[in-house]
Amino acid sequence: MAGEVYFRTTETDYMSFSVKLGEGGYGAVYRGQFPGGSNVPVAVKLLTNKKGTGEDFENEVTTISRASHCNIISLLGYCLEGSHRALVYEYMQNGSLDLYKFGSIFDSIERKQLQWHKLYEIIVGVARGIDYLCTGCRTQIVHFDIKP
């Protein structure tokens, strides 16, 4: 299961950067590094939409952290301290698939082009990840916001 990260650690170890990777309905995502000098890059989602109780959030974290599949990003940690909520995921160095389709509004990365064989590999990977969520995961996961 993902480990708890305290907000103070999140502010000093994760928020000491200015690279905003994106923003969605639940909050902004930033690039940071795992604490302890390991230089492992992570993606930190700072949640602004805080519906539900802390217990609801912890239940969701438990469910998400049980999902383990090569086509699903791993949850490494979380923060639930007072009103602060954050999710710490592994960092995907090639970025989100939407960069290849739309480009990025947060930096100067232009739209990237994919060859058909690579696009096919991505489609198959997305399908395998969704299949795992629907049929292969021991815990039933209702997925509303799948991002390929």
Where are these regions (language model features)?
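Conserved eukaryotic protein kinase-like
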Residues: 1-148
